[in-house]
């Protein structure tokens, strides 16, 4: 059995491998209770939502930032220039919340309004700029092993391949490429987007992913508080299964109660 260790991103240790979002909840109260039920440590916040929404400041005030590490994201940005500008604003938001040393940014560059698929070229361009500005960059990408490796090589702190389109609840549609990314990566791999139920979160962890990021599946569940707990259990179970090591698949059956060396008397 493999020994477990902390999730380390940008030199910071985290005990939870479940990251969560703050969008789509019916109320701030439901959001906060759900966040607590996940036992997560990293919470992502859409900078533009806080910036533009009249209740944006209220969102920041509702969350106890001594319990959670803020992960500002650049959702709503269609090109690298926009993403860099919003990332800089996000760093200031983190400071306003009391996290002076927080340089984390979840990099999203999405010009596609229908399927919300990330732009690989603009993502790479933005990542290069942000790394030079001392950001801890967590880029959201398609399940593209070549892009993932390139982002690692330029200095990203994680890669975050999608399971399926944002909010679709379709689960992990490209297991082969996700597995290749995990196999080739020397930085944490966080599966982001598309997870709909705890079994899919567990599946991602069983593959060897270092964590998952979930928002819609919790926020839009009939009972977000219960789903938050369930996702926590799913991630933990998947991680334990990965560490334990699954049995090898084989074509033929193998009796669990063999008849060899049994007395015939």
From Swiss-Prot:
Location(s) in or outside the cell: Cytoplasm
Cellular component annotations (GO), alphabetically ordered: cytoplasm
Taxonomic placement: Bacteria, Bacillati, Cyanobacteriota, Cyanophyceae, Synechococcales
Gene3D superfamilies for this protein: Aldolase class I (3.20.20.70)
Source domain of life: Bacteria
UniProtKB keywords: Cytoplasm, Schiff base, Thiamine biosynthesis, Transferase
One GO BP annotation of this record: thiamine diphosphate biosynthetic process
Annotated protein name in UniProt: Thiazole synthase
Active-site feature positions: 106 (schiff-base intermediate with dxp)
Sequence similarity: Belongs to the ThiG family.
Pathway: Cofactor biosynthesis; thiamine diphosphate biosynthesis
GO molecular function: thiazole synthase activity
Main function: Catalyzes the rearrangement of 1-deoxy-D-xylulose 5-phosphate (DXP) to produce the thiazole phosphate moiety of thiamine. Sulfur is provided by the thiocarboxylate moiety of the carrier protein ThiS. In vitro, sulfur can be provided by H(2)S.
Gene: thiG
UniProt-listed SUPFAM superfamilies: ThiG-like
């Amino acid at each position: 059995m493999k020994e477990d260790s902390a999730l380390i991103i940008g030199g910071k240790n985290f005990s939870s491998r479940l990251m969560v979002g703050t969008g789509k909840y019916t109320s701030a109260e439901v959001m906060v209770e759900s966040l607590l039920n996940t036992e997560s440590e990293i919470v992502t916040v859409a900078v533009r939502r806080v910036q533009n929404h009249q209740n944006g400041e209220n969102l920041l005030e509702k969350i106890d930032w001594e319990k959670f590490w803020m992960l500002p994201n650049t959702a709503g940005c269609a090109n690298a220039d926009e993403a860099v500008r919003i990332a800089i604003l996000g760093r200031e938001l983190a400071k306003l919340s009391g996290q002076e040393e927080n340089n984390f940014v979840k990099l999203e560059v999405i010009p596609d309004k229908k399927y919300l698929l990330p732009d690989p070229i603009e993502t790479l361009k933005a990542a290069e700029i942000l790394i030079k500005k001392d950001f801890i960059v967590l880029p959201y990408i398609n399940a593209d092993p070549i892009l993932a490796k390139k982002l690692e090589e330029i200095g990203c702190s994680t890669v975050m391949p999608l399971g399926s389109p944002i909010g679709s609840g379709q689960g992990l549609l490209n297991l082969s490429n996700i597995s290749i990314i995990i196999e080739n990566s020397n930085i944490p791999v966080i599966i982001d987007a598309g997870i709909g139920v705890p079994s899919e979160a567990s599946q991602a962890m069983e593959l060897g992913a270092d964590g998952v990021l979930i928002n819609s599946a919790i926020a839009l569940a009939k009972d977000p508080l219960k789903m938050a707990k369930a996702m926590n259990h799913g991630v933990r179970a998947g991680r334990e299964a990965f560490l334990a090591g699954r049995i090898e698949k084989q074509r033929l059956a193998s009796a669990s109660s063999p008849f060899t060396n049994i007395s015939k008397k």
